[in-house]
């Protein structure tokens, strides 16, 4: 395994390159720089060899949100809806950089993320056909209007595999929006399965902040199998 790092389009990229040619390329968006921990967890789980591109997203509320939504709390930050602009950078600059550096040609590209990045991973499927496998771990499917968006629009290409997961305590809250997370995740899982997409849904123990790296690795592992 060889690791290469660069800052491109304002984002820190870490590319863990497979030794073999023509291995899959997994694109993983992280809140800060936890990509290496997720990659090491994948290795511990004896995951099939892959190229792993970790992208640290620092303007999380903007770049991972598909449209504007108010803050979840009085002191919180609003979601400003910059996902389309970020996706353009991903497709036009970041992915070409990674593709030039892997051995051979990726057998497939998958996209994965946790929390708001899990929502972005699904959103991207409606905007581009580059990715053929997608995983949203503890995805922010409480996001206002997202469930409806998924049902009212068509993916650019139906994925070969789709993975969703959530912690069993994540919806145990009085917050009127956040408490819809498990219900919305399960409803979307049922909807995607009805489209004939090979889907897996996993209910993990704990709240939103428990075993994050392990949950991410489990989801990515499903894409690689």
Predicted regions span which residues?
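Serine-hydrolase catalytic machinery in alpha/beta-hydrolase-like enzymes
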Residues: 22-101
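Gly/Ala-rich beta-loop-alpha elbow adjacent to hydrolase catalytic centers
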Residues: 112-117, 121
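Alpha/beta-hydrolase
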Residues: 28-30, 137, 166
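A domain-start/cap signature at the N-terminus of enzymes
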Residues: 1-24, 50
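Short beta-strand immediately N-terminal to the catalytic nucleophile in serine-hydrolase-like folds
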Residues: 108-113, 137
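A conserved short beta-strand
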Residues: 130-142
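The feature captures the conserved acid-bearing segment of alpha/beta-hydrolase catalytic domains
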Residues: 141-213, 217-224
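Active-site signature of alpha/beta-hydrolase-fold catalytic machinery across serine-
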Residues: 123-127
């Amino acid at each position: 395994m060889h690791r290469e790092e660069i800052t491109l389009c304002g984002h820190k990229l870490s590319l863990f390159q497979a030794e073999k040619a023509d291995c899959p390329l997994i694109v993983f968006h992280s809140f800060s720089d936890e990509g290496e921990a997720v990659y090491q967890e994948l290795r511990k789980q004896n995951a099939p060899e892959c190229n792993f591109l970790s992208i640290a997203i620092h303007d999380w509320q903007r770049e991972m949100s598909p449209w504007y939504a108010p803050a979840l709390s009085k002191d919180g930050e609003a979601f400003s809806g910059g996902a389309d602009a970020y996706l353009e950078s991903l497709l036009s600059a970041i992915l070409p950089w990674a593709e030039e550096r892997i051995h051979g040609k990726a057998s497939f590209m998958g996209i994965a993320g946790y929390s708001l990045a899990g929502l972005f991973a699904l959103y991207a499927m409606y905007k581009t056909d580059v990715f053929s496998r997608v995983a949203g771990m503890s995805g922010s499917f409480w996001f206002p209007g997202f469930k409806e968006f998924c049902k009212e629009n068509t993916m650019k290409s139906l994925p070969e595999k789709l993975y969703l997961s959530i912690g069993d305590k994540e919806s145990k809250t009085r917050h009127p929006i956040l408490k819809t997370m498990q219900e919305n995740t399960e409803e979307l899982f049922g909807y995607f399965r009805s489209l004939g997409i090979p889907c897996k849904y996993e209910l993990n123990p704990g709240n939103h902040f428990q075993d994050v790296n392990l949950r991410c690795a489990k989801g990515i592992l499903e894409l690689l199998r």
